[in-house]
Design a protein with these regions (language model features):
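Phosphate/pyrophosphate-binding catalytic cores of soluble transferases and nucleic-acid-acting enzymes
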Residues: 1-221
Length: 221
């Protein structure tokens, strides 16, 4: 095939990767009127009551989705209202044969201690680059805590720091801990859910990278 049509996809979010690797049954398009009705109902009831109402029609999704996850709550409600089938039904329609495309899956699984050290340093770099000022600016415009941006790792801790509710050292420590826990969940997901073609545990090992490159060349034919 044309080499320019070959794609390299890099990411760490397990659910997106799962959807990419498996050809899922397409969910019918949701009419705008249903989307509007769902949002109005959620705003009227509040997230917690809306989730309880969702559980009567789609208990599987309601159990999986946290009350604060507005977007996913709305999506589950919209799908059921439009199709009269729960979102879990559509997720179960994935084909066992997987995607029509061929993938060579490379998984980066660094040693946990090294990974956690990088997580800690990464957040310190954010601090040096002005993350606290960004947190203060975001808080000043009263962004909804239910928006995805408000769930950024470390944001809540930095906002507490800017309000004088936490010392900077405590905010950093708590944010670093949250980041490490997130990384741990990702490692667990990849270990149990991804059937990789090549595993890289040491990025600085030239032989490992060379071996991976050779396998990719063989895969491409």
């Amino acid at each position: 095939g044309d080499v320019y049509k070959r794609q390299i996809i890099c990411g760490g979010t397990g659910l997106y990767i799962k959807f990419l690797l498996n050809e899922l049954s397409a969910i019918p398009e949701i009419p705008p009127s249903i989307k509007l009705e769902a949002r109005e109902k959620l705003e009227d009831l509040g997230n917690k009551n809306f989730r309880e109402l969702l559980s009567k029609n789609d208990p599987v999704s309601a159990r999986r989705i946290k009350s604060g996850d507005t977007n996913r709550l709305l999506r589950a409600w919209e799908v059921f209202t439009a199709t009269n089938k729960p979102l879990s039904y559509w997720h179960e329609q994935s084909r066992e044969t997987g995607s029509q495309h061929k993938f060579f899956k490379v998984c980066l699984m660094p040693e946990r201690k090294a990974l956690y050290s990088k997580c800690d340093k990464r957040f310190l770099d954010f601090i040096e680059q002005g993350a606290a000022d960004e947190a203060r600016a975001l808080d000043s415009i009263n962004v909804s805590p239910e928006l995805p941006a408000s769930k950024t790792l470390g944001l809540l801790e930095l906002i507490k720091y800017t309000k004088g509710e936490l010392e900077l050292s405590d905010a950093v420590e708590q944010a670093q801990r949250a980041t490490r826990l997130y990384a741990k969940r990702q490692l667990t997901w990849f270990r149990h859910q991804l059937d990789e073609d090549f595993l890289i545990q040491n990025l600085s090992c030239s032989k490992t990278v060379s071996d991976c490159f050779k396998k990719i060349v063989n895969f491409l034919g």
